[in-house]
Amino acid sequence: MRIGIVNDSALAVAALRRALALDTTLEIAWIAGDGEEAVRMAATQTPDLILMDLLMPVMDGVEATRRIMAESPCAIVVVTMDLGRNANQVFDAMGHGAIDAVDTPTLTDSDTKLAAGPLLRKIRNIARLLGGRGQAPHPLAAATPTPTAPRLVAIGASAGGPAALATLLGALPADFGAAVVAVQHVDEAFAQGMAEWLDAQCQLPVRLARAGEVPQAGAVVLAGTNDHLRLTSAGRLIYTPDPCDYLYRPSIDVFFESVVEHWRGEAIGVLLTGMGRDGAQGLKAMRERGFQTIAQDQATSAVYGMPKAAATLGAASEILPLQKIAPRLVMTCGGGRR
């Protein structure tokens, strides 16, 4: 895998060099000292993956991510110091198509492998994702409908998802007539910050899903850990490490499939922007169950991977531009009365 490094700190670049040297399958294609240089390098030597810092002179990592994804798209992971303090910039970069984020490893002679572990695990997962390796579908038993259960909107998103979720959820009215559960590919270290970031932009309350709760109409909950979020036979949300071999954690497919198996009311599946195929099989299972399913269109997707996979499978009953998804949900579920 060919990797570009974008960072203005000599110490950070040295740390990244040492971390990448631990895996012989990784090759440093180039190093850029600011976002503007990275945009030029990506255009002439597009790598498989870019490790993008956020705070740099000339052009910061958010704008560089936006430019690269528009002009020379490739996988981008934000790698910067003190991610927690820069959470808003992380979500902005992910909104433009960055896949993930991780702290810059701090390396010493004694703990190089340990410190580099989180970064290398993310890179290996991205390598698998770029190779197209997903999970095989398995037969599902559908739940028996119960008229008292509220309507559920199940949303999945990955690269580009934070901005897409902000647009979609921000357009839902305060009296929206369905429960909303969203699974965004984001490390649990950023989940709480993302929930707060979305809550500030939405009329509906947004928070992390709690184990044991039942989704409630008029509220949005987000998957909040690196375990999978799923529904139980009682219609309650739980976190589970199984299945262990899934590339994506939390997995959209796992949640969508649990909706098919256990949700006793009506449901709508929505698959937004993202790299790879997660959610496509689950959305197909939802459609086969008789649920309404929506995939974001190519023109408005920061990364047209997951929605494209869904469209190819025939998983989406509708393919819509992002700005038309919320009105469609309101039309179906109710809300926005004056």
Curated annotation (Swiss-Prot):
Q: What class of enzyme is it?
A: hydrolase
Q: What is the active site of this protein?
A: S158, H185, D278
Domain Response regulatory positions = 2-119
Q: What is its main location?
A: cytoplasm
According to the UniProt entry, what is the EC number of this protein? 3.1.1.61, 3.5.1.44
A molecular function GO annotation: phosphorelay response regulator activity
Which pairs of Cys residues are joined through disulfide bonds in the record?
none
Signal sequence, start to end: none
- 4-aspartylphosphate sites (modified residues): D53
Q: Which InterPro entries match?
A: CheB-like, CheB_C, CheY-like_superfamily, Sig_transdc_resp-reg_Me-estase, Sig_transdc_resp-reg_receiver
- What catalytic activity is recorded? [protein]-L-glutamate 5-O-methyl ester + H2O = L-glutamyl-[protein] + methanol + H(+); L-glutaminyl-[protein] + H2O = L-glutamyl-[protein] + NH4(+)
**Occurrences of domain CheB-type methylesterase (ranges):** 145-330
Annotated domain remarks: Contains a C-terminal catalytic domain, and an N-terminal region which modulates catalytic activity.
Which family is annotated?
A: Belongs to the CheB family.
The protein's job, in short, is:
Involved in chemotaxis. Part of a chemotaxis signal transduction system that modulates chemotaxis in response to various stimuli. Catalyzes the demethylation of specific methylglutamate residues introduced into the chemoreceptors (methyl-accepting chemotaxis proteins or MCP) by CheR. Also mediates the irreversible deamidation of specific glutamine residues to glutamic acid.
Question: What is this protein's name?
Answer: Protein-glutamate methylesterase/protein-glutamine glutaminase 2
User: From which organism does this entry originate?
Assistant: Cupriavidus metallidurans (strain ATCC 43123 / DSM 2839 / NBRC 102507 / CH34)
